[in-house]
Amino acid sequence: MSDKKHVVVLMGGWSSEREISLLSGRHVGKALEEAGYRVTLLDMDRDIAFKLREAKPDVVFNALHGTPGEDGSIQGLMDLMAIRYTHSGLTASAIAIDKELTKKILTPENIPMPQGCLVERESLYTKDPLPRPYVLKPVNEGSSVGVAIIDESFNDGQPIRKDQIDPWKNFKTLLAEPFIKGRELTVAVMGDKALAVTELCPNNGFYDYKAKYTDGMTTHICPAKIPAEIAEKAMALSLKAHQLLGCRGPSRSDFRWDDEAGLDGLFLLEVNTQPGMTPLSLVPEQAKQLGIDYVALCRMIVEEALAEDTLQETKMAGQGG
């Protein structure tokens, strides 16, 4: 019998981010094989508990994106099954995927975030929830799925029509936020360290799903060419958010920075507990800036999960125990 550690790479699933998850998972699996692990790739389905029991992994590498791999569901299952796994636990995952709940925890801790409102989809047919321009997005999705900027040019300033609702047809409740002009920044955190700041410059002016995952659609500038005090603040806020939410392993914090407002123009948009691991992904890119290649990064994530007591859910910072 092999003495290699057995890593199950969990990927796919049925969320809107399935294809990206499959791509992440395949790259991770190949890297972990190069790192010397025995690797099994598992496509998430309704029989996943049975498949995990049969596989008998030493640890699961969670390469899922969206529900149920990013919202605490699969984390809770693996907790019940006493299976070690990478990335954040149940509580941090469930909070971070809910953008409005995340605000309620981070804003009182002096982490600036755009303050919007929850809106029922049907109400959009009669009036705008906020003055234009504003951003409309699902409450519980990642990868910029369903995110749109509603400005004066949208429908000639008139309310959204029913035939324009397709991006949000599967979401009864949406989040509306004031649009923050300026630049798109992102920071990866690994463990207790913020890695770097990347500026994202989409060719079409908006960092949507297509811009994120289509080669050549977005220019990544890493490290970002921004004032040192902005980079320091973004990295400090990212690490603080990671710790307050109780994240472990890698996370990624996304920001908008109004460069005309200086330090006061930096706003955290969301914390992603399952950042992508594709060739275009930001965590591997920032790790590379620090001299950590892709194989080494995947090994670090696995070894952290094996070393920590991930069999008991990570508690949120500030709680006892």
From Swiss-Prot:
GO terms for cellular component: cytoplasm. Binds 2 magnesium or manganese ions per subunit. GO terms for molecular function: ATP binding; D-alanine-D-alanine ligase activity; metal ion binding. Coiled coil: none annotated. Mg(2+) 1 binds at D254, E270. PROSITE patterns: ATP_GRASP, DALA_DALA_LIGASE_1, DALA_DALA_LIGASE_2. The keyword Mitochondrion does not apply. Residues 103-303 form the ATP-grasp domain. Its cofactor is Mg(2+); Mn(2+). Keywords: ATP-binding, Cell shape, Cell wall biogenesis/degradation, Cytoplasm, Ligase, Magnesium, Manganese, Metal-binding, Nucleotide-binding, Peptidoglycan synthesis. Its EC number is 6.3.2.4. Pfam families: Dala_Dala_lig_C (PF07478), Dala_Dala_lig_N (PF01820). Mg(2+) 2 binds at E270, N272. GO terms for biological process: cell wall organization; peptidoglycan biosynthetic process; regulation of cell shape. It is found in: Cytoplasm. It catalyses: 2 D-alanine + ATP = D-alanyl-D-alanine + ADP + phosphate + H(+). Pathway: Cell wall biogenesis; peptidoglycan biosynthesis. ATP binds at residues 129-186. Belongs to the D-alanine--D-alanine ligase family. Cell wall formation. PANTHER family: D-ALANINE--D-ALANINE LIGASE (PTHR23132), D-ALANINE--D-ALANINE LIGASE B (PTHR23132:SF23). This is D-alanine--D-alanine ligase. It comes from Zymomonas mobilis subsp. mobilis (strain ATCC 31821 / ZM4 / CP4).
